[in-house]
Amino acid sequence: MLSVQIENIGDLAVVECEGRIVGSEAAFKLREAVTSQRDARTVVLDLSEVRAIEGSGLGMLVFLQRWAYDHDIRLKLFNPTKSVQDRLEHAG
């Protein structure tokens, strides 16, 4: 299960994620949180409390990077846990 909190500071949005980004429900929840931040210039995904990420989550990160680029928004990943960092590096 994934829980998401959003904090807006000026034109910066911090999306704090906690739990697991596993399965389509979690991936869609992440998509909704990020794509709702259309007024932000930068969106930071705080992954410090994410315990696991699987293929659907990785695919959603790719989608969100493209979405952000298309909307002139910078998407930044912040402080991923070791297991998430390993998955990101392995995925390339």
Please give the residue ranges for each predicted region.
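Short beta-strand/loop segment at the start of cytosolic alpha/beta domains
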Residues: M1-E16
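Amphipathic alpha-helical interaction surfaces in cytosolic regulatory modules
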Residues: I21-G92
